[in-house]
């Protein structure tokens, strides 16, 4: 059933029908389409735009269709143009002429953005739960590794000693920001567009606030042209999804490196690894690699919609039909990525000894040696130069700084005393960094407490429970 056609002398070409159809994509919004139609039909009856009898017939029919679709008694007809025409034609088939009244005071232009907002609000709720679960995994892993020394890197060169807990909590901060962006996207999705019509509202005395309340929106949109033209909320969501994938990808890249024989910092659980068809010894970090690869796919979804929208005049244009495929693909990809990544991190084993050995072999305590001299009265720039000379000699002699005798150290500066060895002990290097945000156990425990409170604040929230 087409929702148009009176002014045409002949039907559309079958190829055009296939090209124009969106039913393969938007059929996943059947619940939202029916929910929106239920609220609309109820409002039409309350406003006496249609009779109470007609309103009741329509809502009863819609509820029956929803029940049958949920139970797979009714399946979507893929020859329909879109989910809106399918629901309306199915309704008319079941209840007769009353079904033709459903579209009174409504256009597909405001109907489709209503469906999409209803769908996206639910999806954002689920997405935030998935991120919060990953945060819980990072929280528990961080508690286990407050004292696990590892090298921190800059330019992928060993820099200063930190702890695995400190490292994991860095990603927890990223995902906290991601949750903030999801919350923001939800707020801007939470405005009800129905009643905007094709572009200029309606001549009927509709009650948009009633529909908004019935559907759980906090407000209504205020300009009908903008309402049917707006896909900012989709683009904002895609941007947030892209950042989530960027964070997962960065973390995945590190996991991939840590799994190598050269690093051997972690071992992934068999359940989150794969093998080789030819090399029996292989254990591959495919989950992390796939997440890294799928990041480009989500970026592509964002660029797709930005490109679609960049040249569109007001109001609705058919180009906008491309929004849902990009959004649904990104949502599906990010959701699966978050869940598999959380499982991978939760089950991975940490090689604490290898992490500490790696930190010890990279002169990661050189800054602390310079700081030792400064605290004894040297200027930092002078101390920096002295320690640089010490490191150079250690490299030549294949030694670590702590292998040098006090006499050897005094050749570079008479300031060195016996207490220097405690100052450059890796645990001391970490524990002395008590500044908020640092790797000391005191600082990390504070970060853990903050993360716990961040997670706890969502208890009882619709987007958590």
Curated annotation (Swiss-Prot):
Gene3D superfamilies: Fumarase/aspartase (C-terminal domain), Fumarase/aspartase (Central domain), Fumarase/aspartase (N-terminal domain). GO terms for molecular function: argininosuccinate lyase activity. It holds the Pfam family ASL_C2. It is an enzyme of class 4 (lyase). One of its GO terms (cellular component) is cytosol. It comes from the Bacteria. Its EC number is 4.3.2.1. Keywords: Amino-acid biosynthesis, Arginine biosynthesis, Cytoplasm, Lyase. It is found in: Cytoplasm. InterPro entries: Arg_succ_lyase_C (IPR029419), Argininosuccinate_lyase (IPR009049), Fumarase/histidase_N (IPR024083), Fumarate_lyase_CS (IPR020557), Fumarate_lyase_fam (IPR000362), Fumarate_lyase_N (IPR022761), L-Aspartase-like (IPR008948). CDD domains: Argininosuccinate_lyase. Pathway: Amino-acid biosynthesis; L-arginine biosynthesis; L-arginine from L-ornithine and carbamoyl phosphate: step 3/3. Belongs to the lyase 1 family. Argininosuccinate lyase subfamily. HAMAP family: Arg_succ_lyase. NCBIfam families: argH. This is Argininosuccinate lyase. It comes from Clostridium botulinum (strain Eklund 17B / Type B). The lineage of its organism: Bacteria, Bacillati, Bacillota, Clostridia, Eubacteriales.
